[in-house]
Amino acid sequence: MFTGSIPALVTPFRNGKFDEVVFRAHVDRMIEGGSSALVPCGTTGESATMTIEEHNYVMAVCIDQTKGRVPVIAGCGSNDTKVSLAHLRHAAKAGAAAGLVVLPYYNKPSQEGLYAHYSYLAENSPIPILIYNVPGRTSSDISVETLARLSRLPAIVGMKDASGHIARVSAQRLACGSDFCQLSGNDDMALAFNAMGGVGCISVTANVAPKLSADFQKACAENRYQDALALQDRLYPLHSALFSDSSPAPVKYALSRLYSDFSPELRLPLVQPSDHSKALVDAALSHARLI
């Protein structure tokens, strides 16, 4: 089972190209900060603006740089089932431990369509799959009932839940079993999510505060919820500020404030965060005692 603080990695760019040197350094920072796994090529990694060749290369670089120190859960989502399967097969070949597969976006399949999509992938994928439910981005929302059906398939081992509905953690635990890996997709809800049966977070904030995020998850796992609450108070302004503009723009800005070699460059249609967002990020970094 995947547990703890799992950064959803940003993908650094410079002059329009993948900045491999900076990315490798970022991977090392995440691991040295206590992260328990890594997720490249997800939403935070701007996978939507990568070519398939770039996607596969970034994934492979991440796996190479980890050197087996932590597992890699590769972003393998697409709204084309066969493309998603191709990503899963490439991830397996590169050495990923699992694939994170977001609900198909834009084409808005029915619940039966979602079941067909994931069951096809489960039948054909060489690695385990975690379902990623983020209705705010996909306009699709997997039901507890559909999730329960899918959880019976051996290759479907868990989910990243960014639905924003905290009560679902209990409903999904009862429907899918306590061994079904539930990871929060919302940093600001991670404390409550873990208290209700979650086992970690695929985190945006961990890009900026890997050690604090890992310490927070460790406190939750050890039932030290007063310690976890203190860390949540320290991190909460950052959780909020990092979504004060289109993600991952604020995250990249924060990293550029912390590391001189990290460019805040994004790919269109994303643009730099507003001055207001930058001010919120600066204040949050100060509150967390990171600057």
Swiss-Prot record:
Pyruvate binds at T44, I202. One of its GO terms (biological process) is diaminopimelate biosynthetic process. GO terms for cellular component: cytosol. PANTHER family: 4-HYDROXY-2-OXOGLUTARATE ALDOLASE, MITOCHONDRIAL, DIHYDRODIPICOLINATE SYNTHASE. It catalyses: L-aspartate 4-semialdehyde + pyruvate = (2S,4S)-4-hydroxy-2,3,4,5-tetrahydrodipicolinate + H2O + H(+). Keywords: Amino-acid biosynthesis, Cytoplasm, Diaminopimelate biosynthesis, Lyase, Lysine biosynthesis, Schiff base. The gene is dapA. SMART domains: DHDPS (SM01130). The record marks T43, Y106 as: Part of a proton relay during catalysis. GO terms for molecular function: 4-hydroxy-tetrahydrodipicolinate synthase activity. It is found in: Cytoplasm. Its EC number is 4.3.3.7. InterPro entries: Aldolase_TIM (IPR013785), DapA (IPR005263), DapA-like (IPR002220), Schiff_base-form_aldolases_AS (IPR020625), Schiff_base-form_aldolases_CS (IPR020624). This is 4-hydroxy-tetrahydrodipicolinate synthase. It comes from Zymomonas mobilis subsp. mobilis (strain ATCC 31821 / ZM4 / CP4). NCBIfam families: dapA. Belongs to the DapA family. The active site is at Y132, K160. HAMAP family: DapA. Pathway: Amino-acid biosynthesis; L-lysine biosynthesis via DAP pathway; (S)-tetrahydrodipicolinate from L-aspartate: step 3/4. Catalyzes the condensation of (S)-aspartate-beta-semialdehyde [(S)-ASA] and pyruvate to 4-hydroxy-tetrahydrodipicolinate (HTPA). Homotetramer; dimer of dimers. It is an enzyme of class 4 (lyase).
